[in-house]
Swiss-Prot record:
The gene is priL. Regulatory subunit of DNA primase, an RNA polymerase that catalyzes the synthesis of short RNA molecules used as primers for DNA polymerase during DNA replication. Stabilizes and modulates the activity of the small subunit, increasing the rate of DNA synthesis, and conferring RNA synthesis capability. The DNA polymerase activity may enable DNA primase to also catalyze primer extension after primer synthesis. May also play a role in DNA repair. This is DNA primase large subunit PriL. InterPro entries: DNA_primase_lsu_euk/arc, DNA_primase_lsu_PriL. NCBIfam families: PRK02249.1-3. Heterodimer of a small subunit (PriS) and a large subunit (PriL). It comes from Archaeoglobus fulgidus (strain ATCC 49558 / DSM 4304 / JCM 9628 / NBRC 100126 / VC-16). Keywords: 4Fe-4S, DNA replication, Iron, Iron-sulfur, Metal-binding, Primosome. Its cofactor is [4Fe-4S] cluster. The keyword Protein biosynthesis does not apply. One of its GO terms (molecular function) is metal ion binding. [4Fe-4S] cluster binds at residues 268, 341, 350, 354. Belongs to the eukaryotic-type primase large subunit family. The lineage of its organism: Archaea, Methanobacteriati, Methanobacteriota, Archaeoglobi, Archaeoglobales. Binds 1 [4Fe-4S] cluster. GO terms for biological process: DNA replication initiation; DNA replication, synthesis of primer.
Length: 370
């Protein structure tokens, strides 16, 4: 049957662009016809607002048929690995693999429902505030990354990684990452081990591990899922309902800096706070920097935890532990000093040349003049 091997893949990974080749329908009509998909999308976004992931999806646990196919055809032998694939999907158009009609219909339906749910959820968050869309992007990228990890580590479906990589514009050679892809990913992760200067580079390819490739794809997917898409009237009621909840939630983490003089914050700290307020997923180095800095200038643990409630991956218990540790209320009892300007530059958290050696010096100088 035409495109049969792709149905289980699209049921698990509906964000793939190949869906537009496999399915052709009016999205508005289909969403109104399959109302369950809009409800499923609502649950996904609702949990994203709460910082949780919805695991109850329209998925399919079937194998990628080409990997074990016994058909003696060129496409299965050469294209089943997706090596060199350009996403034309022409090699799957004439699939002659036989499955009972009921099974084929199930594969098709699961893929279609998964795709409609994905589309509806993208539409809903596209009509909402940036912080909701960011939480959604972080949660969904993490969810699909977990599926991909399961497919690779438990089922040996490595061709699926190649398909996802091609779809996201990532260049891979085995488990090596092309330098252009590595730079795109590392610009957002901002972890010391993701700095190009710390990696082995040969003929344009960066030595990376399987885990790093999967982490890189997760980051690229997060960037894709954060983009806005056109919104259909079919999800308007869901948007109104969830927008009310998002408004209530955002009021909980409205930024209150207490006695802190916002005008005297150094540019680097203002930038980190701005990203937090927009619901951005800031790197660990930036989280440590802003936490230690705000503690150093007099903010309380509870006040700082309240700031982090807008983070897409906020976890109250984990955040409290980390903030209390930096404050010296756990561990050895020593309060940490915020990083110097040199350290901020090292981790790409510096955004301006303030002609000082430490963010605290900037703040104290400004306060003394006010």
């Amino acid at each position: 049957m035409k495109y049969l091997p792709l149905y289980p893949i699209l049921a698990r990974y509906p964000f793939l662009r190949i869906a537009s080749r496999v399915f052709s329908f009016n999205i508005e009509d289909e969403l109104r016809k399959f109302l369950d998909t809009v409800e499923a999308a609502k649950r996904i976004v609702d949990k994203a607002i709460d910082g949780r992931v919805e695991y109850d999806r329209f998925t399919d646990e079937s194998e990628f048929f080409c990997l074990g196919c016994e058909e003696n055809c060129y496409d299965c032998q050469k294209r089943g690995t997706l090596e060199g694939c350009d996403l034309c999907m022409g090699c799957f158009e004439n699939c002659s693999l036989y499955y009972p009609r009921e099974a084929v219909e199930r594969f098709y339906t699961n893929a279609k429902l998964s795709l409609l749910t994905y589309i509806a959820s993208r539409m809903i968050v596209s009509a909402m505030e940036d912080w909701v869309r960011m939480r959604y992007a972080v949660n969904e990228a993490s969810y699909y990354s977990r599926l991909l990890r399961e497919d690779v580590e438990e089922s040996g479906k490595e061709p699926i990684v190649r398909l996802v990589a091609i779809d996201l514009g990532a260049k891979l050679k085995g488990w090596k990452m092309h330098v252009s892809t590595f730079v795109r990913v590392s610009a957002r992760i901002k972890d010391d081990k993701w700095r190009l200067v710390n990696r082995k580079l040969r003929n344009g390819w960066v030595e990376t591990t399987k885990a790093e490739v999967l982490r890189g794809l997760e980051e690229l997917l997060r960037m894709k899922l954060f983009e806005k898409v056109p919104v259909s009237e079919a999800v308007s009621e869901a948007v109104r309902e969830l927008s009310r909840k998002a408004k209530r939630e955002s009021e909980k983490f409205a930024m209150d800096l207490g006695e802190v003089d916002l005008n005297c914050l150094p540019p680097c700290m203002r930038e980190i706070l701005s990203e937090l307020q927009r619901g951005m997923n800031i790197p660990h180095t930036a989280r440590f920097a802003i936490t230690s800095f705000l503690l150093n200038i007099g903010m309380t643990v509870d006040e700082i935890i309240a700031l982090f409630k807008s983070a897409p991956d906020f976890d109250d218990e984990k955040t409290r532990y980390q903030v209390e540790h930096i404050a010296g209320e756990r561990g050895k009892g020593a309060e940490y000093t915020s990083p110097s300007c040199d350290t901020m530059r090292t981790y790409s958290n510096c955004v301006a040349d303030c002609r000082v050696s430490h963010p605290l010096i900037y703040y104290k100088k400004c306060k003394s003049k006010s």
